């Protein structure tokens, strides 16, 4: 990407009165973070590590390791599949596995989220013929890893598929209603996994 970014959030960084959960993702996780916070208010502090970096970028792993080691987490929600779409599936799968094993060494409760669809620019009702097959292949790889490691899956793809009214025109992102819908589903998955 021409511009790389990392956006992190520690909620009530000095407080220890509630357990913490960690959301890991790309820009989609930035969108639903506030909704997850509202849903889990009073139950968990909701921290977030979001980045544009592809999963094989060495800085991705270094930054995430540093961030994830700051606190003990009750649960981690891992949603990272919309960046670096030109990389081969094998590279994605290999580095996803490495990242997953690093996370599991810190927290046994990891939820694997399926990435959301990509639509044509200015046509939120039409799936991208070029990019959405990449998302589907990556989601299939995540499902196989979830089965192998016996981890829960949060299907954010199906949650928003076929709902053009909650999509923005850029092909990737969601309206406030779309982010709220995802946030509720993420919070539900976190509550279930963190029990």
Residue ranges, per PLM feature:
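Alpha-helical cap/lid subdomain in secreted, periplasmic
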Residues: 38-43, 59-195
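Serine-esterase "nucleophile elbow" of acetyl-processing enzymes
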Residues: 1-72
